[in-house]
């Protein structure tokens, strides 16, 4: 994209009514959620696309840069930074990444052009504890909706390691 598409901050999301945004970002690349004639992006999507130079975010006539969006996201979610690292890693690998809040996870991940997601991703810091009950519950939900449960562990250097968790019945 040559000229960044303008988006406007609205609460914990950004939106655009521009047809170019809908065609290039939503229809062609799977970003955001379309509601009527508006394309809404999460703050993580907005930060990613701002960092790539594809969009610019405006709040009250002031442009929000990548660092501003990261700071805003971190003020609303203490794990915003690691969720962003995982989001960026998956998007850079060519996957479509959507919220998985309704499945009790952070992300649903789709292969490009796939209608259904293959994975549910739960993002954790390397030193963060997760109880066996948390792991079991997430694996059970993923199995119930025919998806693979994946733990994305982010170390202090910002590197991500993915662990697939399977529900096995004997």
UniProtKB/Swiss-Prot annotation:
It catalyses: pretRNA = a 3'-half-tRNA molecule with a 5'-OH end + a 5'-half-tRNA molecule with a 2',3'-cyclic phosphate end + an intron with a 2',3'-cyclic phosphate and a 5'-hydroxyl terminus. Its EC number is 4.6.1.16. InterPro entries: tRNA_endonuc-like_dom_sf, tRNA_intron_Endo_cat-like_sf, tRNA_intron_Endonuc_cat-like, tRNA_intron_Endonuc_N, tRNA_intron_Endonuc_N_sf, tRNA_splic, tRNA_splic_arch_short. Homotetramer; although the tetramer contains four active sites, only two participate in the cleavage. Therefore, it should be considered as a dimer of dimers. Belongs to the tRNA-intron endonuclease family. Archaeal short subfamily. Endonuclease that removes tRNA introns. Cleaves pre-tRNA at the 5'- and 3'-splice sites to release the intron. The products are an intron and two tRNA half-molecules bearing 2',3' cyclic phosphate and 5'-OH termini. Recognizes a pseudosymmetric substrate in which 2 bulged loops of 3 bases are separated by a stem of 4 bp. This is tRNA-splicing endonuclease. It comes from Pyrococcus horikoshii (strain ATCC 700860 / DSM 12428 / JCM 9974 / NBRC 100139 / OT-3). The gene is endA.
């Amino acid at each position: 994209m040559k000229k960044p598409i303008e988006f406007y901050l609205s609460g914990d999301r950004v939106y655009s009514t521009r047809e170019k945004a809908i065609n290039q970002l939503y229809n062609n690349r799977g970003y955001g959620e379309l509601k009527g004639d508006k394309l809404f992006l999460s703050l993580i999507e907005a930060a990613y696309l701002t960092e790539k130079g594809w969009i610019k975010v405006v709040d009250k006539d002031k442009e929000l840069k990548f660092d501003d969006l990261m700071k805003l996201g971190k003020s609303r979610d203490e794990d915003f930074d690691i969720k962003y690292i995982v989001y960026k890693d998956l998007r850079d690998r060519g996957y479509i990444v959507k919220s998985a809040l309704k499945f009790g996870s952070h992300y649903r991940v789709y292969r490009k052009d796939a209608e259904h997601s293959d994975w549910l991703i739960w993002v954790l810091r390397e030193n963060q504890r997760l109880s066996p009950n948390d792991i079991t519950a997430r694996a059970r939900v993923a199995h119930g909706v025919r998806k693979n449960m994946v733990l994305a562990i982010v170390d202090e250097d910002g590197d991500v390691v993915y662990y697939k968790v399977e529900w096995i019945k004997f």
